[in-house]
Swiss-Prot record:
This is 10 kDa heat shock protein, mitochondrial. It comes from Rattus norvegicus. The modification N6-acetyllysine is found at K8, K40, K56, K66, K70, K80, K86, K99. The gene is Hspe1. The keyword Acetylation applies. Keywords: Acetylation, Chaperone, Mitochondrion, Phosphoprotein, Stress response. The modification N-acetylalanine is found at A2. CDD domains: cpn10. Induction: By stress. HAMAP family: CH10. The modification N6-succinyllysine is found at K28, K40, K54, K56, K66, K70, K80, K86. GO terms for cellular component: mitochondrial matrix; mitochondrion. It is found in: Mitochondrion matrix.
Length: 102
């Protein structure tokens, strides 16, 4: 993570701030892909998390991901947040589809 602009932003409640991974621009065979054929990037790295949302009994439910986790995002959704000319996306914890495990 080159910049630290996301440190100026703290998500509230069950929100998660992510930085999308870069799209593949070259195939394994060395062929350059045009932008239209690259597809939408659904992988991201978590850069900040909120404190959690309220459960049914009023207790705070912690967010299910932590900073540094690699996650799978839905194709649509999220709120674009621009910090120091860099694009980040804000999702609810429940909207994140999964977490990659090493």
């Amino acid at each position: 993570m080159a910049g630290q602009a996301f440190r100026k932003f703290l998500p509230l409640f069950d929100r998660v701030l992510v930085e999308r991974s870069a799209a593949e621009t070259v195939t394994k065979g060395g062929i350059m892909l045009p932008e239209k054929s690259q597809g939408k990037v659904l992988q991201a790295t978590v850069v900040a998390v909120g404190s959690g949302g309220k459960g049914k009994g009023g207790e705070i439910q912690p967010v299910s991901v932590k900073v540094g986790d690699k996650v799978l995002l839905p194709e649509y959704g999220g709120t674009k947040v621009v910090l120091d000319d860099k694009d980040y996306f804000l999702f609810r914890d429940g909207d994140i589809l999964g977490k990659y495990v090493d």
